[in-house]
Design a protein with these regions (language model features):
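Regulatory and interdomain segments flanking nucleotide-handling catalytic cores
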Residues: 1-233
Length: 233
């Protein structure tokens, strides 16, 4: 089996052109990093990803065990973006949704019939499951200002679905409550950086990095990832 991660940016229409362009640039840079040198920081992850229409993400992973870590890396990348407060109250409500949730992501686990990276074509059970879940969320939440979940796990294997869904539901709560700075620290920890490396990168002291790491629940997240990676896919 393989994995596909499908995702769409929450309230992307509330971002101005410069913000949206920066977000797209950051996502594409991340995709290029995985694709160009999959062994850098994240380990050997056979990976292909692309951005569609500026706010829809699709990523293929040969190894399903790596899918949750990559999903969290994407999630934290989006959520660590800082937005200025808008004077328009209606617009600010939408921008707050982006700040809180960032991006909806669905992990689909299943077979893949076609993985054509040259043509950008992905087809098969895994992408059908992840894509359908995101499409369902986009339509059901179209007129709502309350979003219940933003991380999903889909597979036709009942036992695996039960195991995976419990894990992503718990992580969803942690990340929804995380601040932009906490997500930034978590993002680099997920990529394999040490707290010392992160402190230098963010130009803060290591104690501050450790404080954010503890507040976001890094130990629990790390244990959850290790458990997920040992599931029988």
């Amino acid at each position: 089996m393989n994995a596909v991660i499908s995702g769409d940016i929450v309230s992307s229409t509330a971002l101005n052109e410069l913000e949206l362009e920066l977000l797209r640039k950051n996502v594409l840079q991340l995709i290029d990093t995985f694709t160009g040198d999959p062994s850098a920081q994240t380990g050997d992850i056979p990976f292909y990803g692309h951005l569609i229409k500026g706010d829809y993400i699709e990523c293929y992973l040969k190894e399903p065990k790596d899918s949750l870590r990559v999903a969290l890396i994407i999630k934290t990348l989006v959520k660590m973006m800082v937005l200025e407060k808008s004077p328009d109250n209606a617009l600010e409500k939408k921008r707050l949704l982006f700040k809180k949730y960032g991006v909806r992501l669905a992990i689909g686990i299943g077979s893949m019939r076609t993985v054509d990276t040259e043509q950008g074509i992905l087809d098969g059970e895994a992408i059908y499951l992840s894509g359908r879940k995101i499409d369902d969320q986009r339509s059901s939440n179209k007129e709502k200002v309350v979003i219940k979940n933003t991380l999903f796990f889909e597979t036709t294997e009942n036992k695996l679905k039960e195991q995976g869904s419990v894990l992503v539901d718990l992580l969803d709560v942690l990340l929804t409550n995380a601040t932009a700075r906490q997500c930034e620290v978590l993002h680099y920890k997920l990529l394999g950086f040490t707290e010392s490396d992160i402190a230098q990168k963010l130009e803060v002291n290591q104690a501050a990095v450790n404080q954010h790491s503890t507040a976001v629940g890094w130990n629990s997240i790390e244990h959850t990832l290790k458990y997920y990676e040992q599931l029988e896919f």
